[in-house]
Design a protein with these regions (language model features):
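Intrinsically disordered, low-complexity segments enriched in small/polar residues
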Residues: 1-297
């Protein structure tokens, strides 16, 4: 006799980590910058193995010092400095954070090397901060030169905060540059804003499980009375895909086939772009009578 398994309902979009945990991925040849409070813990996971990590720390006094982690340096931080001198995205974020806090990359002169080229996959090193500090975890390595040695690989950093986030408190990703404007769009509402050529627009689902509609119009033509927005047919035809995505096929076009927007990053990956807006009938048929919907909004 086959005994059926007890199944649990699956609720997509719920946070996988607790209110005191944060998960970061350190790209090969990249870094991640952490702001730590007293009592915060973090661990570095060597995902594929054979990957060295370098740990740099700034104390609350602004000095490059590993004492907040109760560690003594065994290296001079050159590997991390070389990474931060590049135009790699995580390096720009680190430089932005350090600049706002008044720290200089040139002041990095102490670090500790974690793991080695012989470290096994999923090896873990754990640390705890006893003071306010800024820590940089980097995954140094050469480019993929297969005839010399293994290429650099990713590291995972999991932070356990001493203070849990309160209900309604959210954690935002680090901005690349100083934000020009931040808009909090409340539920059931919409917001309009004007951007210049070259500006970046970042839409963040703060709490998860929230759909959003995005529309764009050419401001100059709109002032002339021409309402030219994102065109479904031209965007799909010129990009050769159901919806644009980062990479070669990344642009949205208007009715005259002029490029309007380019997708730079997409952590969702699946969208109902150019789909029909939801209506009250859609929810009525499902039994949710009077549910707010895009068409009524």
């Amino acid at each position: 006799m086959i005994i059926p398994r007890i199944t649990k309902p699956y609720e997509p979009g719920l946070p996988a980590l607790g209110n005191d945990l944060e998960n970061y991925l350190v790209n090969a040849g990249g870094s991640v910058t952490l702001k730590l409070e007293p009592g915060d813990k973090f661990k570095i996971i060597n995902i594929e193995g054979h990957q060295q990590a370098e740990l740099v720390c700034f104390s609350s006094k602004g000095e490059c010092d590993l004492s907040p982690l109760s560690l003594k340096h065994n290296h001079k931080g050159e590997l991390t400095k070389n990474i931060l001198m590049t135009n790699e995205e995580s390096a720009q974020i680190a430089k932005y954070k350090l600049k706002n806090l008044g720290y200089e990359i040139e002041s990095i002169d102490k670090s500790i090397l974690v793991f080695s080229e012989s470290s096994l996959a999923n090896s873990i090193e754990e640390f705890q901060s006893n003071d306010q500090s800024i820590c940089i975890v980097s995954a140094p390595g050469e480019s993929e030169i297969t005839h010399e040695k293994l290429p650099a690989s990713e590291l995972r950093v999991i932070v356990e905060r001493s203070r849990k986030r309160e209900e309604g408190e959210f954690l935002l990703p680090d901005p690349l540059m100083d934000p020009i404007e931040e808009i909090f769009v409340k539920r059931y509402t919409a917001a309009a804003y004007e951007v210049q050529e070259g500006d970046y627009i970042q839409v963040i689902d703060i709490f998860g499980r929230q759909c959003s509609d995005f529309m764009a119009f050419d401001a100059e033509k709109l002032h002339k009375g021409q309402e030219l927005g994102i065109d479904t047919t031209n965007s799909r035809y010129l990009m050769g895909s159901a919806f644009p995505m980062p990479g070669l096929h990344s642009k949205y076009y208007d009715e005259n086939q002029f490029p309007m927007l380019e997708v730079y990053r997409d952590t969702v990956g699946r969208h109902d772009t150019f789909g029909t807006a939801c209506t009250s009938k859609f929810y009525d048929d499902l039994g949710y009578f009077g549910h707010p919907n895009c068409s009524d909004n």
